[in-house]
């Protein structure tokens, strides 16, 4: 009989997401039906469990990255905010995002000819194919190319190459901390074509305003257009997470989609994103707007 898999974050059948640095004094808990997999990869602790209400859950270094029930909200927004702010995206790069969810959204755009993914940890890709098949299905798409390695080096090797670059990073602790700094945005800028657009994960305005202010400042020093937007998603801390959306084209209004499709086509392609949500996601509550604008 196979031995039951245990993990220190799971106590009395409940997974607890606790961080004294990123969200002190609060925690997300999910009831665990079964632990599916646990390993320590070369870079991080990888846990996958089946929850009673949110399907399979991917956890990296004790932090929820995706659940089958709500992942589409984040993946759709981080991808389509960028892709629909570019007039004709042909070559797209995803940094991180080894679960494949962002790639799945990228290849929905007919204009895209190449969709690259660069992730440092092969374990996330391998395990997502096994346990998150709806997210990872895009790895078999003919437009998709995968590179296992360091995002910084990849960007240095591909100057002036990509129309859109999407950074699907974890929180700014440990290896991901450098993805929130000015040097990284300068590398992104250099790897973009003339009217290039980026989106990057940008934390929750409810608990991370100082981080977001620094992030917006770093982006604004590199890109002429740098705006903050957000999405609601129940299994991320505070139920919201934000994005920086930036363009090299100073005339670009990232707050309105450049290319629109019919309502019927939207309903067919997306479960969260639509043209109205695109615009609304940049409208911030009064207190947050005061801090960030």
Swiss-Prot record:
Transferase recorded as keyword: yes
Binding site for S-adenosyl 3-(methylsulfanyl)propylamine: 44, 75, 99, 119, 150-151, 168
EC numbers: 2.5.1.16
Pathway membership: Amine and polyamine biosynthesis; spermidine biosynthesis; spermidine from putrescine: step 1/1
GO biological process: pantothenate biosynthetic process; spermidine biosynthetic process
EC category name: transferase
A single cellular component GO annotation: cytoplasm
Record bears the keyword Transferase: yes
Catalytic residues (UniProt): 168
Positions contributing to putrescine binding: 74, 168-171, 236
Gene3D superfamilies named in the record: Spermidine synthase, tetramerisation domain, Vaccinia Virus protein VP39
Protein family: Belongs to the spermidine/spermine synthase family.
Protein name: Spermidine synthase SPE3
High-level lineage: Eukaryota, Fungi, Dikarya, Ascomycota, Saccharomycotina
Gene (UniProt): SPE3
């Amino acid at each position: 009989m196979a031995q039951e898999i245990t993990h220190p974050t799971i106590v009395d059948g409940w997974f607890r997401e606790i961080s004294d640095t990123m969200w002190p004094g609060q925690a997300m808990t999910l009831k665990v039906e079964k632990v599916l997999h646990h390993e320590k990869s070369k870079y991080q602790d990888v846990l996958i469990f089946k929850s009673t209400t949110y399907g399979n859950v991917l956890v990296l270094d004790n932090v929820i990255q995706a659940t089958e029930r709500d992942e589409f909200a984040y993946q759709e927004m981080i991808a389509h905010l960028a892709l629909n702010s570019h007039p004709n995206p042909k070559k797209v790069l995803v940094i991180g995002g080894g679960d494949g969810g962002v790639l799945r959204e990228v290849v929905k755009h007919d204009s895209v000819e190449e969709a690259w993914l660069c992730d440092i940890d092969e374990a996330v890709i391998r395990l997502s194919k096994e346990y998150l098949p709806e997210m990872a299905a895009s790895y078999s798409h003919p437009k998709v190319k995968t590179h296992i390695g360091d995002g910084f080096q990849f960007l240095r090797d591909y100057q002036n190459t990509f129309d859109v670059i999407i950074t699907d990073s974890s929180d700014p602790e440990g290896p991901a901390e450098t993805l929130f700094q000015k040097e990284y945005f300068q590398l992104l800028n250099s790897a973009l074509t003339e009217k290039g657009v980026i989106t990057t994960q940008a934390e929750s305005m409810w608990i991370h305003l100082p981080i977001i202010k620094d992030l917006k400042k770093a982006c604004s020093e590199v890109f002429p257009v740098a705006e903050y937007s957000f999405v609601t998603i129940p299994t991320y801390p505070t139920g919201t997470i934000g994005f920086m959306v930036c363009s090299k084209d100073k005339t670009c209004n990232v707050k309105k989609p450049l290319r629109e499709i019919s309502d019927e086509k939207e309903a067919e392609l997306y479960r969260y994103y639509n043209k109205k949500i695109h615009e609304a996601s940049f409208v911030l509550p009064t207190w947050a707007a005061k801090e960030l604008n």
